[in-house]
């Protein structure tokens, strides 16, 4: 063993011992004694063990010597210690990359129609299958069926071949195939694999949408079987796999049943060029009259749940979805099943020389919860039933008694209770027409039409007029199409505005009327104007009576007069329709205003005279404080809503409207700056946007994103302070080149802040009195999620008792409407403040949510022992004597006291309530004070704040809010406030009862 065959030594009796059988040939030698090493005995066991241990030690020493020499060689040549291991790992990974193969399961694994030996029998000829000669129950599998090339286009439709093209059979009287009941009549499609080989670059971004469509279905919900999104990159194949589980008849249309529709959204190949090649793999099973397919558990349990998949060779940018349209029990209950079987034609003998052909009775049967669409069948179809059923209907009480109906018409199923809205073409849905006179001497600010919308729409006799008047629920928007045909050498700007309600002698300025829904129109640029709106901003439906009782208002105003005066007065025609577009609510939520806040804030009119002279126009973006007028401010709902926050920021989207003749040309640049900027040429170093209108271009939108503003800014500024010191941004405009034309007139632009995107509001705003003037050189202006501060109240009412009165007194605050009424005593000092909460409650047409109220009562300086005054407070929803109180408080605390409470505004219109509306008998919320001693309780302040659940919708047109000096203003830190408080005295425009 191991080369030691010559190892010999003496042992016992001087005999030579040899340890190898190789020398057994010397067994007859007289001097030697041979024995087998593996022969175990008690005498030689320890010798043999020692010999084996010696051999093992020798091998270990030899191995260590070899490893030492190899380590010295590696160190000598400088080979890193981990190189061999890394190469081994790379070789292991490389050897694991098997060749690409079809991923679709073979047909034998999808079905279990045959035994194992029968499947082996079919393996030999499965590649040469003639499906027309196969019997039923035979598994078939086709690989790499050519589906054609994928062409570079937006949408591409490719046929999915299931089998090779079937050869047309020659008609013959002989049948050499299988018997009729055994031959295949249909093919069950178990799996389809769509293989795409792309010709595009392997590093491109081309994506494709794929949709497997069953063309025998006409409705999309049934036709679409699988949807995929896959990358179309070159290199390895992309494979989309699905399991249709569909039986297809064996006829000439078998290869037209399924189609793959491709959508290539970012294709950059030349139009019509070859983008890739498509091939199809299919596995299925034939069926016949006597034998069907038997799916395997793999197909029914695993692959059926897996549905559509994408074999990923190109990464993970793949998506797949299998559609299903299984009906629910409710859908089945609404279906109507109609059965009809025609009678049999037979010949009957009527005499010895004559006979007739007659048809027996036809069968009709209906299953369903509702009557079929053809509710009254044709008389010809029911003729047999009417003649045969001459005895009438059997009475269910007594089978021997027959009840004869008095009418053949089912009155309950004539659809006389149809509540749907008028629908159809424009001719069918037009319900009113109004002509508005446009005078030839028209100037900016002229009111062309101001009326409640009901008065404009009622009294017409168009097709839909009566239908609209008799419909309780109209779900479509109101659509108005206006037409004027003006020459292009003139021009003007008309504003068509609608608002949910109005009060008193409201302002008709475009700032006030244009905050809800409006459109600005220059008839010289476009000959017609299409305007749609929802008259119920907090709901999805309306009615004509709803418009009448809520005083929904329509205004047509001239914003900018004629560029060139026409020779005669002009008539504008307004046609009114019920739109097929559904009404969509527009609700403003105080707690979660949303990312996009629609403002429709009129920023001002910019006039640039012709010539090369230039000037700077600035429009403040502190837009919460309203617009200033003489001794008053103009306010609308959206600006009051923004003023609830102390600061705000977002992306500002402006609409720039051309209001002069298209023949007057100019290029205007817009940029963001700060107040007090001097005019200089380098102002265009600011990031700016150049506006240049085309011939008939009427308007353009520009956006200044959040990146233009370093921080948020205030929604209100002190109107008495200097413009340069408010620290808020301005929208600036100036002429880039010059203004010129072949006709006279200025280049006029109207600027509107349409919406604020990505809106963020910060903090609550107690409010600032007053606002900067609207118009002039500075074209005007002033304003969630939201970071707010709880506990900030806005003072809305301040009442001081008469100094000469020594008895009891009473007054009432309309918490929603903003008015104050007193008893018959004179000398009351009443002040209603224009705070953000008060402005929003007055200008918002519809309100819903919780309002928190704080009442502060201040008394005169008398001793506690002399205090005798008691104040009773009554919270009511109506001032009628027949109405009950909602809550009552009694306060007799000497000196001063504070009362805090809350109430919920809830109404009939999707939870919203309108102030003092005739619709649904809506009222308001009133807080009535009854003071037993007005000389001791002398001053009352009512403050309010809105809960985060408070919502508003729609605008109420209001008169200008008065701003007058008040000598009775409460001092602040011992000094009179520099900003005068707003004062409403009983009998003034706002203090009296609400106008009708």
Curated annotation (Swiss-Prot):
Keywords assigned: Capsid protein, DNA-binding, GTP-binding, Host cell junction, Host-virus interaction, Inhibition of host innate immune response by virus, Nucleotide-binding, RNA-binding, Suppressor of RNA silencing, T=3 icosahedral capsid protein, Transport, Viral immunoevasion, Viral movement protein, Virion
Feature type site, description Interaction with the viral RNA: 423
GO biological process per UniProt: symbiont-mediated suppression of host innate immune response; transport of virus in host, cell to cell
Site entry (Cleavage), positions: 406-407, 782-783, 972-973
GO cellular component: host cell plasmodesma; T=3 icosahedral viral capsid
GO molecular function: DNA binding; GTP binding; RNA binding; structural molecule activity
Keyword Membrane: no
Comp. bias intervals (Basic and acidic residues): 375-398
Region annotation (Involved in tubule formation by the movement protein) ranges: 363-369
Organism of this sequence: Red clover mottle virus (RCMV)
Region (Disordered): 368-398
Pfam families: Como_LCP, Como_SCP
InterPro entries tied to this protein: Como_LCP (IPR003181), RNA2_polyprotein (IPR003182), Viral_coat (IPR029053)
Gene3D superfamilies: 2.60.120.20
Protein name: RNA2 polyprotein
